[in-house]
């Protein structure tokens, strides 16, 4: 059993129980919460925990939950689960403090690896991995077009919208996006968004 607890926040009981069962079978200590409000009331007592929350919930969304945790100065590594293509909301969650986001549907290994990465924040700040000065230096290597594409990605725009706005083909957007990922040494889209925000680079 892990020495930290995974807190699952989802308003749908079958989803909550299914995820909890899978994680328990893989050696994680788990606690379930039926709503963002329920977890927020419990959060001050959390010690050594990782939060996995659904993004879209009634009454209080995952983004609002993260913002409330921030207002309360409660620092818990958080992962948000989003619907496919819900990148704009996921980006808002990253700005609110999430360390990762995962799109549905996902394989068990994807959420397990995300939780293990998030748990590393319990012992080491991410700044140790991606120094802000290094990130700004990488941003300086981007071409003007690459910076435009990155800005659109951080804004949560899909490739087709970026292509339309910049008057280029979707394939060209994919090429620029791949170049940005390589120059920024980003392991994934969430990692790229985190670095861009840490480097002070937001949507134009």
UniProtKB/Swiss-Prot annotation:
Q: Which InterPro entries match?
A: CheY-like_superfamily, Sig_transdc_resp-reg_C-effctor, Sig_transdc_resp-reg_receiver, Tscrpt_reg_LuxR_C, WH-like_DNA-bd_sf
Q: Where is this chain's protein located in or outside the cell?
A: Cytoplasm
Example of a GO biological process term? nitrogen fixation
Entry's cofactor comment: Binds 1 Mg(2+) ion per subunit.
Q: Does the keyword Nucleotide-binding apply?
A: no
4-aspartylphosphate modified-residue sites:
54
Residues the UniProt record assigns to the DNA-binding region sit at 159-178
Q: What is its cofactor?
A: Mg(2+)
Which positions are annotated as binding Mg(2+)?
10-11, 54, 56
- Domain HTH luxR-type residue range list: 135-200
Keywords in alphabetical order, please: Activator, Cytoplasm, DNA-binding, Magnesium, Metal-binding, Nitrogen fixation, Phosphoprotein, Plasmid, Transcription, Transcription regulation, Two-component regulatory system
Known function = FixJ, when activated by FixL, induces the expression of both nifA, required for activation of classical nif and fix genes, and fixK, required for FixN activation.
Q: What is this protein called?
A: Transcriptional regulatory protein FixJ
Q: Which organism is it from?
A: Rhizobium meliloti (strain 1021)
Task: Quote the gene name from the UniProt entry.
Answer: fixJ
